[in-house]
Amino acid sequence: HRPLSFGYTISLSSTVAMIQDATDHSSSPLLKVKLGGDDDRAAILGIREAAPDATLIVDVNEGWDPEQLRTMIPVLLECGVELLEQPLPAKLDEQLASIEVRILLCADESFYPDCSIQNLSPAFGCVNVKLDKSGGLTKAMQDMELAREFGLKVMVGCMVSSSLAIAPAFAAAQLADYWDLDGFLSLSEDRSPAMRVEHGEISLPAGLWC
């Protein structure tokens, strides 16, 4: 499998801590920023200033209400955010139709096992497929194929997990538009050999399953 550009996740924290995290990882080609805190505007503006060349993806984890989304859209556009993941609680998805987002929306919590893709809000142009959520690699690949049939882009995501779980997600991500595969970095101890992150890319180590 070809190496993939590596995306680093900036976890929701204080604005100062998030900007420092972005500064420390400003060379990463992609930053996935968790928002839904007390001062999202200052956080994303500071992160963009700290990492001017990084592609930015924002994940709100259902953390905004419709008015907060409307308020934040101009800020996200100013920062050049490429994708916005699950801004509203899934139960409020129908309200997305009345909001001019102008950024690619990705469904995560709204895209759950056995949900019907055709019942997703048409505001979504992307779905986050996680092997943990789909039930394994085979089902995840089927979910990806179905999403494509409905004209949706695909992100392959992950939970906090070892490199042994990231490896099949890495295989699926070869066919995805976006990927979020840094869950193994949150572990105090990973499997050895672990997934490799070098020069802004993530790749498989030799002998991962040995």
Question: Which functions belong to the PLM regions below?
Answer:
Residues 1-56, 63-70, 75-78, 191-210:
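N-terminal capping/lid subdomain adjacent to the active-site entrance of alpha/beta enzymes
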Residues 9-11, 29-38, 55-63, 79-92, ...:
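Catalytic beta/alpha-barrel core
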Residues 26-29, 50-54, 74-82, 99-105, ...:
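Glycine-enriched alpha-helix->loop->beta-strand junction motifs that scaffold or abut catalytic
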Residues 31-35, 106-107, 128, 132, ...:
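Long, contiguous hydrophobic alpha-helical segments, chiefly transmembrane helices and signal peptides
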Residues 36-52, 64-71, 88-100, 114-116, ...:
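Active-site-adjacent beta->alpha loops and helix N-cap segments on the catalytic face
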Residues 138, 149, 189:
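Histidine-acidic metal/acid-base catalytic patches
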Residues 141-142, 146-158:
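C-terminal EAL-domain catalytic cores of bacterial cyclic di-GMP phosphodiesterases
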Residues 157-210:
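Flexible C-terminal active-site loop/helix
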